[in-house]
C-alpha cells in the first residue's frame, strides 16, 4: 500500500511496501551477477522515495539467508546519511563460489549492528559491532571533518582476531599465523584530537602510539610510536602477495599519467595527498627483527608532508655494539621530480 506521485519532474513514492524478486539478475541488466550472488531478494517496511532522497523505517531486507533490519535515511541534497541497522548471516559459505574449495574461514555466522549519522562536516557512529567466531570489532565516536579545531571528536575501537590465517583464503593473501588485537582511544582536547591510547599486539610483537592531530581541514599530526619488540618476518609473505595482487590488477609498471604525480613511482603516495597533511613521527623500537640481523634501540624521526619526506634523524645498534646513524630527504624539485639527498 502507498502513494505514487507523478506531479512535475520529480516522481515520488511513499507508503508501506512489500516487494520481492526471485533473483538479482533481472534487476541488474547492465552487469552479470555471479552465480553465488544470484539469490532471492525481498523487502518490507515503511519507505518513501524521490530523486536524491530515500527514507526507510522499520525495514526488513532479505537477501538469500541474510536479513538486514532497521532504519535508513539518504539525503543527497543535504549530504546526509543516517542509519540504524542490524544484520545477521548464518553462514558465509552461502556466498562462496560453488565450484571452488570452500575455505573453512567462510563457514561462520556473522552478526552486525551499526547506527549513526554521516555528513560533510562530521562522521558520527553511536554503535558499531561485528561479531563472528573468528573476529570481533566494536567501536563508536565522532570525527569532525571541517573547521580549524577538533572541538567534539572522540573515537574508541576494539578489534580482536583469533588467528589472521582465517582470512588468507578469503582475501587470497598470505596472512601470518598469529592473533591480532588493536585498541584505540582518541578524544578532543584544547582544539586537538589526542591519541590517548593506540595499542597493537600480534604474535610476539607490540606497538603503542600516542600523539595528536590539529586542524581538521588540513591535519597537522604529531605521533610518537613505541615498541619493545617488533618482528617483521611474519608479514613479509603478506606484503609479497599484496604487491603481486596490485601488480596483476594495475600492470607491471605505473601508467604514464599516475607515475609523475607520485613521490616514489612504485608506491601510490601522490603529491596531492602529501599536500593535505603534515605528519611528524618519532619511532622508538628496543628490538627490531625480520631483517638479516636484529637491530637494537632503533630511534627515528620522520617528517612527511607537502615538502616530501624528511628523515631528521635515524639511529640503530646491532648486537655487537655497532651504531649506525643517517639523515636524508626525498623532496620534489621545482618541476615536481623527487630528489634524494
Regions found by a protein language model. Give the residues of each.
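Membrane-proximal interfacial segments on either side of biological membranes
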Residues: 1-57, 62-194, 205-314, 322-341
Amino acid at each position: 500500500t502507498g502513494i505514487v506521485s507523478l506531479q512535475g519532474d520529480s516522481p515520488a513514492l511513499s507508503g508501506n511496501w512489500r516487494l520481492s524478486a526471485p533473483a538479482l539478475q533481472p534487476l541488474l541488466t547492465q552487469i552479470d551477477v555471479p552465480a553465488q550472488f544470484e539469490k532471492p531478494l525481498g523487502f518490507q517496511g515503511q519507505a518513501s522515495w524521490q530523486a536524491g532522497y530515500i527514507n526507510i523505517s522499520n525495514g526488513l531486507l532479505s537477501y538469500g539467508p541474510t536479513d538486514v533490519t532497521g532504519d535508513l535515511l539518504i539525503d543527497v541534497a543535504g549530504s546526509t546519511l543516517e542509519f540504524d541497522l542490524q544484520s545477521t548471516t548464518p553462514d558465509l559459505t552461502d556466498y562462496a563460489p560453488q565450484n571452488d574449495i570452500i575455505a573453512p574461514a567462510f563457514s561462520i555466522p556473522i552478526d552486525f549492528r551499526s547506527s549513526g549519522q554521516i555528513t560533510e562536516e562530521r562522521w558520527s557512529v553511536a554503535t558499531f559491532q561485528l561479531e563472528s567466531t573468528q573476529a570481533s570489532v566494536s567501536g563508536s565516536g565522532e570525527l569532525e571533518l571541517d573547521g580549524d579545531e577538533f572541538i567534539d571528536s572522540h573515537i574508541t575501537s576494539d578489534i580482536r582476531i583469533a588467528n589472521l590465517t582465517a582470512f588468507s583464503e578469503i582475501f587470497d593473501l598470505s596472512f601470518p599465523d598469529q592473533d591480532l588485537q588493536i585498541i584505540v582511544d582518541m578524544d578532543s582536547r584544547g582544539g586537538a584530537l589526542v591519541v590517548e591510547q593506540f595499542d597493537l599486539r600480534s604474535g610476539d610483537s607490540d606497538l603503542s602510539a600516542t600523539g595528536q592531530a590539529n586542524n581538521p581541514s588540513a591535519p597537522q599530526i604529531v605521533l610518537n610510536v613505541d615498541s619493545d619488540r617488533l618482528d617483521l618476518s611474519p608479514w613479509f609473505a603478506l606484503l609479497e602477495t599484496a604487491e603481486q595482487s596490485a601488480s596483476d590488477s594495475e600492470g607491471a609498471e605505473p601508467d604514464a599519467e599516475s607515475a609523475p604525480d607520485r613521490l616514489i613511482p612504485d608506491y601510490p603516495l601522490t603529491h596531492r595527498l602529501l599536500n593535505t597533511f603534515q605528519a611528524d613521527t618519532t619511532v622508538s623500537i628496543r628490538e627490531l627483527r625480520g631483517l638479516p640481523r636484529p637491530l637494537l634501540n632503533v630511534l627515528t624521526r620522520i617528517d612527511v608532508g607537502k615538502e616530501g619526506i624528511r628523515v631528521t634523524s635515524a639511529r640503530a645498534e646491532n648486537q655487537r655494539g655497532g651504531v649506525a646513524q643517517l639523515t636524508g630527504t626525498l623532496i620534489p624539485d621545482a618541476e615536481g621530480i623527487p630528489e634524494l639527498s
